[in-house]
Design a protein with these regions (language model features):
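Glycine-rich flexible loops
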Residues: 1-129
Length: 129
């Protein structure tokens, strides 16, 4: 069942993230379940999921709120009906690069041919405040 697979995926990818950060969402018919704000990928269970419509609005009258990135997940699931789940993380090694003085050089390199196709010939870097 995709639901159990997504929870398993969340736990596995959490090992490569800062403090279990990131989000997962699962399509469920015309709605989605997304990780609740304040929950971690490492420890999440079905109790840490909030039901939302595909516009990103919470449907359950619960104390838990959906992740602040609910709009991003909702947009993907609404725009691409073939997608059943979305998982994104904040990987430790990627964050090391993003916080280093080498980010501009790294961002302007293209390591794989499909990066040019998907990302174009230039990168946009927004420095951390």
């Amino acid at each position: 069942m995709i639901f159990d697979d997504v929870l398993d995926l969340a736990k596995k990818v959490s090992k490569y993230t800062i403090a279990g950060e990131g989000n997962v969402s699962i399509r469920d018919g015309d709605t989605m379940l997304i990780k609740a704000s304040g929950s971690t990928l490492e420890t999440m269970t079905d109790e840490d999921l909030v039901r939302c419509n595909l516009d990103g609005n919470a449907l359950d009258d619960e104390k838990k709120k959906p992740s602040m990135e609910v709009s991003f997940h909702a947009w993907i699931l609404k725009s691409f009906p073939e997608i059943k789940c979305v998982c994104h993380t904040h990987p430790t090694n990627t964050n090391k690069i993003l916080c280093s003085g080498d980010i501009i050089d790294f961002a302007n390199k293209r390591l794989f041919p499909d990066q040019v196709v998907r990302n174009g010939i230039m990168s946009c870097v927004v420095p951390y405040a």
